[in-house]
Amino acid sequence: MLKVTFLVLAMLISIPMKAMAEDPLDLDGFAFPQPAASDLGKAYKLWATYYYLPEIQEDSGTIALRDMKGQELGPRLTLKHWCDTAMEGSVKINYKNGDIKTFNYQGVTNDYFVDCKSIFPRHTGIGKTKFREANGVYGDGLDDYILSPYRTLATDVTYITPGTALYIPKARGAKITLPNGRVIIHDGYFFAADKGGAIKGSHVDVYIGVSKSAPFFSWIGSNESKTFEAYVVKDQKIIQDLLELHSIK
């Protein structure tokens, strides 16, 4: 019996565990310096929308999150929460036992269609969305990037290449109060680490984490006529630091 116990323990220890990312907000001081003109490159005239991470309680509804094979992932959501999750691309689930998991967009299939027409009349295709457990605390972006609140931009990858750091002067000095009471004074730097089907050309989507709206970023006008200036960052140290905030440690 003792040998069996040791064998089971050895097997458990040898099973590779999923890498868990640290919370980017715990690592981010939002304290990059104001750039010199020589540290900035190409200028863009952009317009912005924002997206966020829905946060809900376990088993709040009856509609399952499913993976690409149609298998249930565990959580069951209300129609509104499910459609919000499909639209935003990720969801944070608070379990009754205290666990927290984030699930992320994986792809689309035609089976197990969820009718979101009553929630998003112009985006009925999101009902085909399938999910997986995310690597990042706030969800995953392109390739191996994780999402970092108030830093990540979803871009048209043919217009702004993933891995590009951008400085937005109008974002510098923005005051953001987090749910835990921490106050961030934004330094104006962002990082292209995600994409979206509706993101084309000069349109960027700003990730705001668990905030539900973005009054602190007045330059986000959700309208292509409301443009602002952004500049490519050339400072390699800042680029590397932003990359690390979007990487699993």
PLM segments and residue spans:
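Bacterial N-terminal signal peptides
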Residues: 5-14
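Sec/Tat signal peptide C-region and signal peptidase I cleavage site
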Residues: 17-21
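Solvent-exposed, well-ordered loop and adjacent helix/strand elements within mature globular domains
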Residues: 22-249
